[in-house]
Every structure is written in C-alpha cells, then in structure tokens.
Amino acid sequence: GSGTPTEAQTQPQQGGAHERVDLPGNMADALSQQQGQVDAATQGMTGAASTLPTAPATVMSGAAAREATRPVQGTAPQQHKTPAKTAAAKPTATQHKSPTTVYTPPAKPSSTAKAGAVASSGSSVQSAPGSHYTLQLSSASRSDTLNAYAKQQKLQNYLVYATKRDGKPWYVLVSGNYASSAEAKRAIASLPADVQAKKPWVRPVHQVQQDLKK
C-alpha cells in the first residue's frame, strides 16, 4: 500500500497545476479577443484606406500596427483622413495663387500714369532736377496734333503736357533733359530740320514742372 500516499501527494500538485493552467488559458482568451478587435480595427482602417491614395494607406497600415496594443477604432482613421484632405487642399491653393502673383506686377506700371502728362516717350523731364533745361518745340490747342508731330519727326524723350493759356487748355511739346542751357542749345543742331525751322527755345525744367501743376 505504499503507492497510495504517493498518488495522494501528486493529486494536489496536479490540482494546483490545473489552477495554474487555467490562468494562462483566461489570458489567452483575453488576448485572442483583443486580437480579434485589433483585426477588426485593421480591416476597418484598410477599408477606409482603400478610398485614399496609396501613400496615406501605407502610413495608416503602419499606424495600425502601432495602435494594435490599444485598438481605438474611431479616432485612428479620422486622424489620418484629415492630413490627406489638407495635403490635397494645399497644392490647389498654391496653384491658384501663383498665376495671380505672376500677372499682377505688369499691370502696376500702366495704372500709375503720371497726372498732367498727356503723352510721353520715356521722358525724364517730370522727374529731372529743376536746375536742368529742356527744349520747347511746339505748342497747340490740341494734344493729338503735337503727339502726331512728335511721332512723325521720330523724336526721342519727348513730353506733351497740358497747361492753361487764358483759362483754356493748352498743350506744349518739350523734348530732352539737359544739365545746362548751353547743352540744350547745342542739342537743337541735332534735331530734324523741320523741327529746327520752328525755332525751339530753351526752357528751365522747373518752369515746365510748374506748368504741369497748373
């Protein structure tokens, strides 16, 4: 009968072993349940990702692996959807902005036409120092005749400006911007013969600028 006590001794050990085995069994069940939730979350996320471009989808699958320990089904896809939207929105915004920045600068110089000047061809008379001199070539009651005349004579650096004579509009054609009256007089010799025949006269630039303000 010496075998019986040994069986009796092993019984509790086996019972104890059963209890210890049960705990891992419960843990395994819990893990498999959690794994099921993770799988569901991953499937849900990959389902949502299928509508997105491939690049965000790869980001999301990486995120799904990170989220496996705590499967939060609702927030993970939303977090990844919003960057995809903003990333898509930004390029279109810049595409629309760039044409406007390209086309606005050329419009500015044309809109800033100087007051008082009717027509000019690169004239620096308006911005020249008051101590400089210019040549008055002609004057008339209409600006278009003076402009036509200046173009006909192929004048460079001319200005047709509006002033008043006896309270009525009067237009003057001046040309050139010279540092001294002597330089202006010498320039008369280089003018077309028809222009010289009108006997151009030297005028201080400050007088012309005063006329422009009238």
From Swiss-Prot:
Record region (Disordered): 1-133
Main location: membrane
InterPro entries in alphabetical order: SPOR-like_dom, SPOR-like_sf
This protein's record includes keyword Membrane: yes
Low complexity compositional bias, start-end: 78-97, 110-131
Location relative to the cell: Cell inner membrane
Compositionally biased intervals (Polar residues): 1-14, 43-53
BP-aspect Gene Ontology terms: cell division
GO cellular component: plasma membrane
Name of the protein in its database record: Cell division protein DamX
Species of origin: Serratia marcescens
Taxonomic classification: Bacteria, Pseudomonadati, Pseudomonadota, Gammaproteobacteria, Enterobacterales
Gene, per the UniProt record: damX
